[in-house]
A protein has these predicted regions:
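Juxtamembrane loop-transmembrane helix junctions in multi-pass integral membrane proteins
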Residues: 1-4, 42, 46-52, 72-75, ...
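Alpha-helical transmembrane segments
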Residues: 2-19
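Physicochemical signature of membrane-embedded alpha-helices that form the seven-helix bundle of GPCRs
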Residues: 9-12, 47-50, 80-83, 106-109, ...
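Cytosolic, membrane-interface loops and tails of multi-pass inner-membrane proteins
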Residues: 22-48
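Core segments of transmembrane alpha-helices
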Residues: 52-64, 114
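Short alpha-helical packing/oligomerization segments
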Residues: 63-86
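Interfacial loop-to-transmembrane junctions
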Residues: 90-116
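Juxtamembrane boundary at the C-terminal end of a transmembrane helix
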Residues: 119-134
Length: 134
């Protein structure tokens, strides 16, 4: 059984990860070069956006793949993937703005999707276990 939805969002997230990394590299190449944030506030913000993406994305993608494999609703998984992806884009742009509205929306969107997927995964596992016991 191909995990079509998970594969689509894994690919999309890989591209987003490359874009987030590129935003950091572009500043280094056009600036003094080197490692770390170089004392440049925009670079520091972009590095945090990239690192934050890398911190959350594996959990979301693993949960999506497992839920899809377990027969979870394709429509709900698509919705979760879209919300997560858009939340991460908002977070990436919002983190370098003086007013953190987009960053906050992105963070809340990320947490909401991760929490929903985690609860859904636990419920699915317990529900399936109860069916096996009966």
């Amino acid at each position: 059984m191909p995990l079509t939805i998970s594969l689509i969002f894994a690919g999309a997230c890989a591209l987003l990860n490359l874009w987030l990394a590129y935003r950091c590299v572009r500043i280094r190449v056009n600036g003094p070069g080197g490692v770390g944030d170089l004392g440049i506030p925009v670079l520091r913000a972009r590095m945090r956006a990239h690192a934050n993406f890398v911190e959350y994305t594996p959990f979301v993608l693993i949960l999506m793949a497992l839920l899809e494999y377990a027969g979870g609703s394709v429509e709900v998984l698509e919705g979760a993937g879209i919300v997560y992806f858009l939340a991460r884009v908002l977070h990436a742009f919002g983190i370098e703005r003086p007013r953190f509205t987009m960053q906050l929306i992105g963070a809340v969107g990320t947490w909401t999707v991760l929490l929903a997927l985690a609860i859904w995964a636990i419920w699915t596992a317990l529900h399936d276990a109860m069916l096996i016991v009966r």
